[in-house]
């Protein structure tokens, strides 16, 4: 037996899911385009920081996606990388040089141009970080060497080693483009949404930090992803984010008609909202699945046999079937099934308690008097947060 002390353990780590939201309206109403008005969106948690590489945290990404554009767009159906702020691009044979042609006429909401120089500064920051401003390196950019502005609308990026994932990296939330004024701010100042100047379809109008955020549509927006059917400014006039931590309060507000969209619906609440005609949108990640991550400096799990034993001792199928719904499919790999390069690794992730026990025996962890595995006087007891 391995004991795990749960502090704030996310059981969803065993599932392949990005986030679940509920949309007001029926399936037929969803096809009708609403023009004008302000969408009321209830968010479970407040955003923490809007430095674009911090966009992997859902509340951060939800804001950044509305106020920033990306160099490229990944089609969610085909997974192809398509033009957005970049009209076109070329990559050399060993993927160490990328050249992008920038769409003309794009501006940030402060009126400054989103040109090659601005793109270069963004990726120099994301690829190298800025120690003076405490801005960290983006997790999706590796081997970055630097940039060169070829002309006002052409920028070239250089890498120390082949970086085949960079093109896809330019399409993710964490690569949102912001103005030079925003990039000049220290990391700690970027939690203030009113200071984030992007080129996206919405701009921040006001904020009550940690409680409420109001956005308004940018009337002159006309540079969305080139292949999308809708072009031009957003159909909505605005979006109002309201931080509402309690699950029951969010659902109650939705059912009472006080909200249009709520994020984070627990599996046990899904039937309730669906029975009222609401639409559940459960988008899976197109990158890395939710995972349990071990600290490599923890001596209890430094032996790979112990980590493998934990994997095979966990009945993920039973957990998903008991605690979740069909919207939480069991992960078949560290990479999502909708991501490029996915390979089904189910056989290597299988529940096998006999194998887990054998691995622990081989690693020297024997069963003690309490029924817990122990070694050198220490019990195999882990804390998970």
Residues of each region from the PLM?
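Bacterial N-terminal signal peptides that target proteins for export
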Residues: 2-14
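Surface-exposed binding/hinge segments that line
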Residues: 31, 101, 136-184, 201-208
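Short, well-ordered beta-strand elements
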Residues: 35-45, 87, 97-100, 119-123, ...
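N-terminal lobe/hinge region of extracytoplasmic solute-binding protein
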Residues: 42-93, 124, 197
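Gly/Pro-rich hinge or "lid" segments in bacterial periplasmic/extracellular proteins
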Residues: 75-76, 171-240, 248-249, 353-358
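Aromatic- and charge-enriched surface segment that lines or borders ligand/interaction sites
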Residues: 87-132, 150, 156-158, 300-302
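Extracellular/periplasmic solute-recognition and catalytic clefts
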Residues: 128-129, 136, 147, 205-216, ...
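Append "and occasionally in soluble cytosolic enzymes with long acidic Gly/Pro-rich linkers
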Residues: 219-222, 302-385
